[in-house]
Amino acid sequence: MQRRIFGIETEFGVTCTFHGQRRLSPDEVARYLFRRVVSWGRSSNVFLRNGSRLYLDVGSHPEYATAECDDLAQLVSHDKAGERILEDLLVDAERRLADEGIGGDIFLFKNNTDSAGNSYGCHENYLVARAGEFSRIADVLLPFLVTRQLICGAGKVLQTPRGAVYCLSQRAEHIWEGVSSATTRSRPIINTRDEPHADAERYRRLHVIVGDSNMSEVTTLLKVGSANLVLEMIEQGVQFRDFSLDNPIRAIREISHDLTGRRTVKLAGGKEASALDIQREYYERAVEHVAKRSPDPMAERVLELWGRTLDAIAAQDLSKIDREIDWAIKHRLLERYQAKHDMDLSNPRIAQLDLAYHDIRRGRGVFDLLQRKGQVERVTDDGEIEAAKDTPPQTTRAKLRGDFIAAAQAAGRDFTVDWVHLKLNDQAQRTVLCKDPFRAVDERVERLIASL
């Protein structure tokens, strides 16, 4: 694949219960979770030695933003490392609660909706060239993003006035605009706020906020890998059939409610097309595009998975993908549970199981139990994930940030960092500006570290 910088930001749902009853407010739980972070970082917004950012977002949601990655498998490992880092905080917070005589179980969920109907996100970031026509990228990408829940939705049991229904996407019900500069108030599909975290004359950061949080490593690979291929094609001038949607927001909900992928949505020109039709167009262009290049095992893996997922949905044979694609894995899980206990989808125990799928605590979370039983496929392994908790990607700017943080902490020096700045808080206030996210070696940073 053409080299690109990408990253994933994940907000986690949080609650604390004691014998099944809510014990603490989300604000209080978040404070306990981040107490260890604040004790060494003097803030609930910190960068870690693996290059990532960990912070408390609006509404008491812990958020983890991966370091800059330029490889899909690397990104999957760093996304999963975020779960492990937060799990460590969870264990520490439960210990503090017990020490204070409060007691209770803390739950962190990698999902997108809570029982009160609030939504929180999983945002993808893709670096694109400033020179490109951003409006064209958004126009061509929008139908792809609206329909890609078919291939990478997390699945959700939605309670409606007509009863419970199983949907492809958790996030679809909470998106209110196609393209916008806001993220929380209006929840668009693509966020246009121009914060490149890089040289603004050369780069722009495409901020996609429509995606579901994925438990499956394979689904994350397909989500980012397919979007990356579509971006690459747009940048290289590949022409697509015009699938501009008449009403993207209505379409995203209608598609989420149809597991067959065959329900048609209205296009801007008056015609209609199904989610399968639209996804198939992007997939077939991608197959042609990749065939013209030198062999690329990762792109070929993404294409094989993408094509097989579309074929499985078209044939309504989910057994072809129910070890890899989140919504299909969860669908299989819930169907088996329903059959075993003779209950319908509206039973509260189904809602509990739906939620437990996203519990990141190993040994308790349902997805983790499926993984331990060998019932889901993987991209990475536990060793790679463990390494990613402390080691930044070695081929991007994240290495400079991570190395600086590790060295400054070891030397006991006070420092401040963000995505582009590395600063020693001494009399000289020495600061290095790192504007190139592709650059993993920088003599200025080496000198700054040597001066510690």
From Swiss-Prot:
Pfam families xref list: Pup_ligase
Primary enzyme class: ligase
Listed InterPro entries: Pup_ligase, Pup_ligase/deamidase
Pathway: Protein degradation; proteasomal Pup-dependent pathway; Protein modification; protein pupylation
Reaction(s) this enzyme catalyzes, per UniProt: ATP + [prokaryotic ubiquitin-like protein]-L-glutamate + [protein]-L-lysine = ADP + phosphate + N(6)-([prokaryotic ubiquitin-like protein]-gamma-L-glutamyl)-[protein]-L-lysine
Sites where the protein binds ATP: 53, 66, 419
One GO process term, biological-process aspect: proteasomal protein catabolic process
Organism: Actinosynnema mirum (strain ATCC 29888 / DSM 43827 / JCM 3225 / NBRC 14064 / NCIMB 13271 / NRRL B-12336 / IMRU 3971 / 101)
UniProt keyword ATP-binding present: yes
Annotated EC: 6.3.1.19
Note: The reaction mechanism probably proceeds via the activation of Pup by phosphorylation of its C-terminal glutamate, which is then subject to nucleophilic attack by the substrate lysine, resulting in an isopeptide bond and the release of phosphate as a good leaving group.
Gene: pafA
Protein name per the record: Pup--protein ligase
Binding-site residues for Mg(2+), renumbered to this chain: 9, 55, 63
Residue numbers annotated as active site: 57
Keyword set, alphabetical order: ATP-binding, Ligase, Magnesium, Metal-binding, Nucleotide-binding, Ubl conjugation pathway
Role description: Catalyzes the covalent attachment of the prokaryotic ubiquitin-like protein modifier Pup to the proteasomal substrate proteins, thereby targeting them for proteasomal degradation. This tagging system is termed pupylation. The ligation reaction involves the side-chain carboxylate of the C-terminal glutamate of Pup and the side-chain amino group of a substrate lysine.
Disulphide-bonded residues: none
